[in-house]
Amino acid sequence: MNKKILETLEFDKVKALFEPHLLTEQGLEQLRQLAPTAKADKIKQAFAEMKEMQALFVEQPHFTILSTKEIAGVCKRLEMGADLNIEEFLLLKRVLLASRELQNFYANLENVSLEELALWFEKLHDFPQLQGNLQAFNDAGFIENFASEELARIRRKIHDSESQVRDVLQDLLKQKAQMLTEGIVASRNGRQVLPVKNTYRNKIAGVVHDISASGNTVYIEPREVVKLSEEIASLRADERYEMLRILQEISERVRPHAAEIANDAWIIGHLDLIRAKVRFIQERQAVVPQLSENQEIQLLHVCHPLVKNAVANDVYFGQDLTAIVITGPNTGGKTIMLKTLGLTQVMAQSGLPILADKGSRVGIFEEIFADIGDEQSIEQSLSTFSSHMTNIVDILGKVNQHSLLLLDELGAGTDPQEGAALAMAILEDLRLRQIKTMATTHYPELKAYGIETAFVQNASMEFDTATLRPTYRFMQGVPGRSNAFEIAKRLGLSEVIVGDASQQIDQDNDVNRIIEQLEEQTLESRKRLDNIREVEQENLKMNRALKKLYNELNREKETELNKAREQAAEIVDMALSESDQILKNLHSKSQLKPHEIIEAKAKLKKLAPEKVDLSKNKVLQKAKKKRAPKVGDDIVVLSYGQRGTLTSQLKDGRWEAQVGLIKMTLEEKEFDLVQAQQEKPVKKKQVNVVKRTSGRGPQARLDLRGKRYEEAMNELDTFIDQALLNNMAQVDIIHGIGTGVIREGVTKYLQRNKHVKSFGYAPQNAGGSGATIVTFKG
């Protein structure tokens, strides 16, 4: 379809109305590329997809899609032989995750019959091996230790060397305390240094890396740690090389599937676009129209989507009707009616819903042409007439029986008598060629043409004679009156002048009386139609109420499980609260040793019930059944605390999992399933302690960022207790920089704790002064 009509009708602005409902960049790109088509099968497919998505929303009202970024360029780079960086891998990882979630959603979907949508869901590919490979990259853009054995080995050596550096520096902190401006280890240029008072700079041998702005502090790397620091620098280089090798290897593994992943991304975007169409339907009370095979148009209560508080109108353009001629004054909304018809057809032929009532029907046109000018002033010049006529001449050479033509103020801008004659001649030519046309005019001569000519119908915009204001209601079958005398009176023209003018025209008002009677009959018919629509609306409300009740019943199923969980959580909280009181009493007894208090706390926590008896809860049974592991599920390996993806199940019941570049064989008890990620996960107040296994597990870490001081100190106390119970040698505490209140609290706590051997800030690349590394006594 020609681009000019899309610009004239502002189709891009209409498409922008759907953008807020999109979740993916792929869907946004498909929306922007959307254009009308004359292929009936494509339009029918789009309509069927929207109807099926509506049915899906009835069963799953909160259906959503994981947001994804455009990856077409990434896949193209892969196909050209380039290696990807971490950010690009994260984009692919997100697409694979979105694809996996959609496949799981479709597999568990019940009570909905899908045909068109099923084709898209079933075309999504399954990549459990690649999912496992991409687990090597976490969402922060960091390559995990388990990505390869070599990377894990290098990082262990780095960790050990850094621990040695910290131990040496901690000893120096104690030995040289009087020479230091502050009793902490600082970091400068990636090296661990001591803040030495300038007066003692020659008392500590080493390399000077920085001097404070005041000159009072010199940051010295002691000679004892220089060699270790050089070893760490060398290991860091090895680490970078290994990370580069991992990127190359995973690029090679993903490369053969680049086209399939790109196709999955397109499907995700397509489903997102269909979802956005249905969300628009829900928001604007739009409908999916019926499709006519013979260019018949029936629009019920149709509105212009870009006009605020638009008046809804009915338009019927039957198969036996060639032209609709809208006559009447220029201020009644004729041009908007013209654009509403054209834009509704463009939207429908683009596979979009329309702003109309159910039962509306649209045709299929190969082209839609329009000559529409926004200028509606009676002071039109010859140049304006020439411009419009040039456009009309061009259109008349292109239109055929498969076109829809919209003509605004046909014949205007020249002598009224000649303009009216030209308008009738053009309409007659179009009628003989059987080209569907809607035209507006203020020439009264065309009223007679509409009455006397077959396959042509008059229409007008309603004018309220009581208020002398247009109502913008479309009156099909009724020619318009200019109401010039009434308007002139309203604007203040002398009644004498108006009366004199009325005597200048033919006093035979038979035609006007007939028009007036037709208007009255139309108004009466509209009242009856409005009553019928009120009944229909009541029926629709009843239908919506039933659907709402159905959805509420489904939600109650989910709520039942949540209530049971809350009940269990309350019991646990009560038990832990009682344990805290007992612990306070224990602390007051000086004869108890610290490790006995820790053990007592652990025993008390065991008293908290792990679960409430929900054996009779049907919702829980169903949820439990759904948690059975399957190929493609993301998991956490319990012994390592690392994430991976299940790739296959062995005959003996064990599972094969891809964890980064490492393939593992696991029993079901050796891993936990990872719940599907939500866009905004609910934050839970908890302290995570990961127990070491053979020194190969990740460091135990506590994140106190964003916590209140009292809350942070309580979590720190619990965290240290658990670490001691698990015989951990070292832990990390992330407190951030911020105002320094929590950092100071952590320092004071660690200074008081007799089980702490040493502590200091983390290396610059591991958090710097925003994190503290704690080493416990053996």
Curated annotation (Swiss-Prot):
Its EC number is 3.1.-.-, 3.6.4.-. PROSITE patterns: DNA_MISMATCH_REPAIR_2, SMR. ATP binds at residues 328-335. Keywords: ATP-binding, DNA-binding, Endonuclease, Hydrolase, Nuclease, Nucleotide-binding, RNA-binding, rRNA-binding. Residues 702-777 form the Smr domain. One of its GO terms (biological process) is negative regulation of DNA recombination. GO terms for molecular function: ATP binding; ATP hydrolysis activity; ATP-dependent DNA damage sensor activity; endonuclease activity; mismatched DNA binding; ribosomal large subunit binding; rRNA binding. Pfam families: MSSS, MutS_V, Smr. Belongs to the DNA mismatch repair MutS family. MutS2 subfamily. Endonuclease that is involved in the suppression of homologous recombination and thus may have a key role in the control of bacterial genetic diversity. Homodimer. Binds to stalled ribosomes, contacting rRNA. This is Endonuclease MutS2. It comes from Streptococcus pneumoniae (strain P1031). The lineage of its organism: Bacteria, Bacillati, Bacillota, Bacilli, Lactobacillales. The gene is mutS2.
